[in-house]
Design a protein with these regions (language model features):
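Short glycine-/polar-rich loops that comprise or flank the Walker A/P-loop
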Residues: 56, 164-168, 219-222
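ATP-dependent small-molecule kinase phosphotransfer cores
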Residues: 40-153
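A glycine- and Lys/Arg-enriched "phosphate-lid" helix/loop adjacent to the NTP-binding pocket
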Residues: 127-207
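Walker A (P-loop) ATP-phosphate-binding motif of ABC ATPase nucleotide-binding domains
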Residues: 3
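Conserved lysine of the Walker
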Residues: 14
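NTP-dependent small-molecule kinase module
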Residues: 20-24, 28-29, 178-249
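Walker A (P-loop) phosphate-binding loop of P-loop NTPases
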Residues: 11
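Hydrophobic anchor at the beta1->P-loop junction of P-loop NTPases
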Residues: 6
Length: 249
């Protein structure tokens, strides 16, 4: 099994990376592509292992998910401008959504399909360390280490941190906040309005390359930095190269 996740600030190019890899695998045609996002949008739940075909698989997923707690996060908690949800509610919701996906779907699937399984993710526990961990630092004045420990103490996060970290994480980097804002204006669907202000985009973008975060991550996974400031083609090429590096070795 190979598990690769793409991370980065909003409008930073994660979607471009995932689409490029999905198209690459579709063109190869030697594996079945199972898009969990599409399944969740259609059926309103996580798939269980028996619903995956018995063939070489590429499984694609996103966090938050599009079902259950993840849908609540997308539709209400991240977008509700009338209610300022506490960082605790936000962090615990993400952690529960994460644990349900891995317990209901991936744990059994990995046992069944260990040799012929490639998993491609958009966001994961690193987003919780950056987004909710960053909120804890900015709102309470806690140190990075204190915020990290608080995030990782939540059962769903601890479960994933100790049992299901990806083999590699591709972090898209865009240092020009004006470019991020321009991309945001051009994008029709916005997933988390409260994090898409210029102030938050700057703070979050810096956190993804913070030496303390990267030091923690390097103990658990391999980090691949993607220069996403240039052309779409350049971003896609880097993403595919990372994917091939881990899935075709």
């Amino acid at each position: 099994m190979v598990h690769v996740v793409f991370e980065g600030v909003d409008f930073g190019g994660k979607g471009i990376c995932l689409k490029a890899i999905k198209d690459y695998e579709l063109n190869k045609g030697d594996k079945h592509i199972f898009d969990i996002d599409e399944f969740q949008n259609k059926f309103g739940r996580n798939p269980v292992p028996g619903e995956f075909p018995n063939s070489p698989l590429v499984v694609i997923y996103s966090e938050p998910t599009f079902a259950g707690v993840g849908k609540l996060l997308r539709d209400q908690i991240l977008k509700d401008k009338d209610v300022d949800h506490s960082v605790d509610i936000e962090a615990e919701a993400f952690a529960l959504d994460r644990r349900m996906l891995f317990e209901q779907t991936f744990r059994g699937l990995i046992t069944r399909s260990e040799k012929d399984l490639s998993i491609l993710g958009s966001r994961g526990i690193i987003s919780s360390l950056v987004y909710q961990g960053g909120r804890i630092v900015s709102e309470s004045g806690n140190s990075y280490n204190e915020a990290r420990d608080e995030i990782l103490s939540i059962p769903g996060n601890y479960y994933v941190w100790t049992n299901f970290m990806p083999d590699a994480v591709g972090i898209t980097v865009v240092n020009d906040v004006n470019q991020l804002l321009k991309r945001g204006e051009e994008r029709e669907k916005k997933d988390g309005a409260k994090y898409e202000t210029a102030e938050n985009l700057i703070r979050i973008s810096k956190m993804y390359t913070d030496p303390k975060l990267l030091e923690d991550l390097k103990r658990k996974t391999t980090i691949e930095i993607i220069d996403a400031e240039q052309s779409v083609d350049h971003t896609q090429s880097q993403a595919i190269d990372i994917w091939k590096k881990y899935t075709e070795r």
